[in-house]
Every structure is written in structure tokens, then in C-alpha cells.
């Protein structure tokens, strides 16, 4: 597969993954679909907006850049061919890689610590000292009185963010290597309308 086609494939994969991260982070802001607890009782990991900023916007830009690097257009002609777009894609992929790593680390921490919830009359991170063992003991999930089903909500959405950011790390890494090869060697696709 040539560098242009690979870039296009990676970009078309990164764009929906970044949108999934943005939506998952938006849903984390409204536990159980309600805004009642949004002001004072969301965990720090939700407020860090790792899905929106890291896995979302910081990966959306390299996704779009990779699609453009894999396309044919006015920048693909001339003395440098498609190398200018590939160079831009190298830098964007590095930024996307950092964003996906940020999303993975914050989401993983959110899974390990658990949500802030009302249990035994106090709002706290009641699962913080379990080192993530609460994830396997679903009977503990019902101990959180408010917000209702917050543990299931957080586990589902943070797990989705972890999975999406792992894929984003892989794809941004592939595009980083692919675009570097594209800068050094050029695109292997034959030019349309050449006289050879």
C-alpha cells in the first residue's frame, strides 16, 4: 500500500474515533443523562476533558490532515509533490499521539479511582482505595445512591474512551511512520496524465 492510500485509510479511521471520544466525554458530564449533579459532583477525570480535548480535538486534526495528505489536489503537484502535506501530517500525528496518550491516562485513572458518588451520607471517591477491584464486583456498584447508576455510566464511558484512545495511539503511530516515509520517499501513486 502506498503512503497516500495508507494516510487516507488512517485519517478516515481517526475521524470517527475522535468523534466517539467527544461524545463519550460529553455524556460523562451528564451522569445517567441528568444535569442535576453536574455542578458539584463530577470526578476530576471528567472535568479534565480528556475525551473532548485529548482523544477528540487533538486527534481530529491529524485525522483530517491524514485524509488531505492521502488525497490529490493542488498541493500534490509541483516540485515537492505530496511531501508538504505529508510533512504537515507528521507534525499533526505527533500531536494526535500526545492527545491520545493523555486521553488514555486520564480515562484509565478514572476507571481505577471510580466516580464521585453519594454513599453512606457523604460524597466522595468511595472506590478510590480498591485499586480498581470494584470493577469486578458489581454488587458494590449499587452502594452509590446518587447519581443513580453512576458507576455503570462511568465504567462504560471510560472503558469506551480507553479502547478508542488505544486505537488512536496505534493509528497515529502508524501515520507518523507512514507520513515520515512519504516525506522522504514521496507518494508511490502514479500521476494522472503523465506522458510515460
UniProtKB/Swiss-Prot annotation:
- Assigned keywords, A-Z: Cell membrane, Glycoprotein, Lysosome, Membrane, Transmembrane, Transmembrane helix
Chief location bin = membrane
For the Cytoplasmic compartment, the record's topological domain ranges are 1-9, 67-89, 178-196
Please name the GO terms that the record assigns under molecular function: arginine binding
Residues modified by glycosylation: 120, 137, 154
Q: Entry's InterPro entries?
A: L6_membrane (IPR008661)
Gene Ontology CC annotations of this record: lysosomal membrane; membrane; plasma membrane
Chain positions recorded as L-arginine binding sites: 123-128
* Any one GO biological process: regulation of G1/S transition of mitotic cell cycle
The record lists the membrane-crossing segments as: 10-30, 46-66, 90-110, 157-177
Which membrane topology describes this protein? Multi-pass membrane protein
Highest rank taxon of the organism: Eukaryota
Q: Which family does it belong to?
A: Belongs to the L6 tetraspanin family.
Its annotated function is as follows: Acts as a lysosomal membrane arginine sensor. Forms a complex with MTOR and SLC38A9 on lysosomal membranes in an arginine-regulated manner, leading to arginine efflux which enables the activation of mTORC1 which subsequently leads to RPS6KB1 and EIF4EBP1 phosphorylations. Facilitates cell cycle G1/S phase progression and the translocation of the CDK4-CCND1 complex into the nucleus. CDKN1B and RHOA/ROCK signaling activity are involved in TM4SF5-mediated acceleration of G1/S phase progression.
State the protein's name.
Transmembrane 4 L6 family member 5
Lineage, please? Eukaryota, Metazoa, Chordata, Craniata, Vertebrata
Task: Name the gene.
Answer: TM4SF5
Amino acid at each position: 500500500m502506498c503512503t497516500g492510500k495508507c494516510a487516507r485509510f488512517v485519517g478516515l479511521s481517526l475521524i470517527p474515533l475522535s468523534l466517539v471520544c467527544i461524545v463519550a466525554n460529553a455524556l460523562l458530564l451528564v451522569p445517567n443523562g441528568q444535569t442535576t449533579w453536574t455542578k458539584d459532583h463530577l470526578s476530576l477525570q471528567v472535568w479534565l476533558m480528556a475525551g473532548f480535548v485529548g482523544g477528540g480535538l487533538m486527534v481530529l486534526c491529524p485525522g483530517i490532515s491524514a485524509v488531505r495528505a492521502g488525497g490529490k489536489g493542488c498541493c500534490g503537484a509541483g516540485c515537492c509533490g505530496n511531501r508538504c502535506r505529508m510533512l504537515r501530517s507528521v507534525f499533526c500525528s505527533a500531536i494526535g499521539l500526545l492527545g491520545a496518550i493523555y486521553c488514555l491516562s486520564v480515562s484509565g485513572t478514572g476507571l481505577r479511582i471510580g466516580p464521585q458518588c453519594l454513599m453512606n451520607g457523604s460524597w466522595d471517591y468511595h472506590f478510590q482505595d480498591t485499586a480498581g477491584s470494584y470493577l469486578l464486583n458489581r454488587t458494590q456498584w449499587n452502594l452509590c445512591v446518587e447519581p443513580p447508576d453512576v458507576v455503570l455510566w462511568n465504567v462504560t464511558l471510560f472503558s469506551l474512551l480507553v479502547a478508542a484512545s488505544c486505537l488512536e495511539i496505534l493509528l497515529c503511530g502508524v501515520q507518523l511512520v507512514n507520513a515520515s516515509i512519504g516525506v522522504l520517499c514521496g507518494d508511490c501513486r502514479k500521476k494522472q496524465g503523465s506522458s510515460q
